[in-house]
Amino acid sequence: MVGMDSLEIRKRFLDFFATLGHTVVPSSSLIPDDPSVLLTTAGMQQFKAYYTGRADPIMDFGSRNTASIQKSFRTSDIDEVGDESHLTFFEMLGNFSFGGYFKEEAIRCAYDFFKEMGLEIEYATVFEGERE
């Protein structure tokens, strides 16, 4: 991955998931068509109707699985902006499944993508429950 720019990373991400049968979906607007939120803050936000069962992914995408690069804007940690790890605007790469697969397959997809990119995963962590 040495010397790879963000355009190449985006392309390889979308191509990888397309080969796995995911429909590539464009980024939705930063101003969502959703009265419950002011701005788009996550990649999954544009798919809310599919997670709640109000929309049919097969009818709209021809697949239960999608991949996208979503423009996102967050203000919840605005006081942290400038510390080299917090931003207000960023693009979130995501793969989503609406009943096509679950956690085990999602983890396998992520691992295979990292492997294809030449990245090594030294360890993984799991959060088992509430901290309280």
Predicted ranges, named:
Residues 2-132:
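Structured aminoacyl-transfer and RNA-binding surfaces used for tRNA recognition/handling
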